[in-house]
Amino acid sequence: MVSYYLHSPQFLALRPRSQKDYEYVLNRALQTPVSVSKAFESIRIAKVSVSDCKIVYQSWLQKGKRMANNTATVLSVVFNMAEELELLASNPMRRVKKAKQEVRRVMWSREQVKLFLDTAYSQYKWRSIGLIVHMAYEFAQRVGDMRLLEWKCIDFDTKRLDLVQSKRRAEVHIPINASLLAMLKEQHDDFGFQEYVAPQVNPRDKNYRPYNEFDVSILVNEVKAEAGLPKELTAMDMRRTAITEMVEAGVATTQIMAVSGHNSPQSMRPYIKHTFKSSQNALARRDSYKNEVS
């Protein structure tokens, strides 16, 4: 059934990036053990039960709520298609209670960012992972866009990034600071012969491919462990951290939106954390205004 879905018009209508992610998620889901001697893929589609789905979902939860829910969502697409084809009476994944994902407020400190990057850049195997996280932080962009970033988006002459975001198709044009520019030039010297800015450092079948989201998570965790950083930190928190830093610096909302690609101030709310520094800056500006008018 999964093979049928992967050749269906519904799947082929997805963007290439989504196709790669869906295929990877489905392949991993099929390998999930249902029992000691049986993998999920060994069960005939008509025989998949709610109990089977609950077992594999609990296994996915060990890798995190986000990953578990994402996998369940993608697999449900296949089950829904099977239901439409009358191969299943109903989608068994619908009856699996999903873990609630709390709104994340986690942020990196500047010291933690530096420690992560120093650790990642210290070993060749983590070089591209370090660059992906570095760009996500400096550009305030999503990790997904950075792992798939192509050299055509980087203009070394004008020192800028020109990107069409994958989620909302927003266009952003961002200057590249000196430290990141130096890393990009070094990366281009070694990997400029192919299209991706931060590909897997070891080619497969002589092809350099981008990391998928799960590999990024695994390798980021490796770097964090080596650096002694808290487990709660994730690469996706870099975007929130960067946006919050701009808020604390007193950058105008419209200017932040020009960097982040948000289409309204309301859509920025999940990324903004109320901090002491923000309050301090706000009250300092109010006091300054009061002194001016008194």
Task: Set out the residue ranges of the language-model regions.
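C-terminal secondary-structure termini that scaffold catalytic or DNA-interacting sites
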Residues: 200-206, 286-294
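Short, basic (Lys/Arg/His-rich) helix/loop patches that form interaction surfaces
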Residues: 118-129, 139, 174, 189-196, ...
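Basic, Lys/Arg- and aromatic-enriched nucleic-acid-binding interface segment
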Residues: 69-71, 84, 88-143, 147, ...
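Basic/aromatic-enriched alpha-helical hairpins
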Residues: 3-62, 78
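C-terminal catalytic core of Y-nucleophile DNA break-rejoin enzymes
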Residues: 166-186, 194-222
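Catalytic-site neighborhood detector that most strongly recognizes the C-terminal catalytic loop/helix
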Residues: 107, 165-169, 260-285
